[in-house]
């Protein structure tokens, strides 16, 4: 099998682009603000993906919601990692520190991360994997975010990609 990889970032200067360059993987930036409409952004993103024959899209810190044309072009071929145990602390506006702030404000004892397929509903696609992470006394949103990344996100996402690529999940 031949795998073509490409990193598409939603903003310049992100660490993913540096990592891609260091690994010899092409990186491009497609920023929503560079386009007059969401539809134009989606068309540019789709064009980039199609030009590079991308079969699987993995969202990791891509802070733009994908529109219907992208989702329809990649049914059950777009993975997203979310920094909470869906269905908790998810949906529009729940990104970055916000899920961690919400979990702490609610007094939760555990949080975690979820890998799911992307569909038309924000964070509403079928769940592939989840991993719980303890919330410790004195946690701040920043400390919790780092723990969730290290203990859950960085483990779940590669596992989910491998499962999809091997055909274990389709």
Model region roles, listed by residue range:
Residues 28-33, 89:
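Short beta->alpha connector loops at strand-helix junctions that form conserved
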Residues 10, 56, 60-170:
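Donor/substrate-binding cores of folate-linked one-carbon enzymes
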Residues 2-3:
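Short, small-residue-biased leader/transition segments that mark boundaries at the very start
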Residues 21, 43-46, 146, 158:
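Generic alpha-helical structural signal
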Residues 12-15, 36, 64-65:
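Short alpha-helical
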Residues 15, 44, 98:
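Short Gly/charged-rich anion-binding patches and loops
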Residues 8-27, 47, 51-56:
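Non-catalytic terminal and connector segments of soluble metabolic enzymes
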Residues 37-50:
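Glycine/small-residue-rich loop that forms an oxyanion/phosphate-binding "nest" at active or ligand-binding sites
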């Amino acid at each position: 099998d031949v795998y073509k990889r490409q990193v598409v970032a939603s903003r310049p200067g992100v660490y993913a682009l540096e990592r891609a360059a260091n690994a010899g993987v092409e990186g491009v930036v497609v920023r929503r603000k560079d386009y007059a409409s969401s539809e134009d952004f989606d068309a540019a993103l789709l064009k980039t993906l199609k030009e590079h024959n991308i079969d699987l899209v993995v969202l990791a810190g891509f802070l733009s919601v994908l529109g219907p044309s992208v989702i329809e072009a990649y049914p059950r071929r777009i993975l997203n990692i979310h920094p909470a145990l869906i269905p908790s602390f998810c949906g529009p506006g729940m990104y970055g520190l916000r899920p961690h702030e919400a979990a702490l404000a609610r007094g939760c004892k555990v949080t975690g991360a979820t890998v799911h397929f992307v569909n038309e509903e924000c964070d509403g696609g079928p769940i592939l994997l989840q991993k719980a992470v303890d919330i410790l006394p004195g946690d701040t949103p920043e400390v919790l975010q780092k723990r969730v990344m290290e203990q859950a996100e960085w483990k779940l996402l590669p596992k989910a990609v491998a499962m999809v690529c091997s055909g274990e999940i389709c």
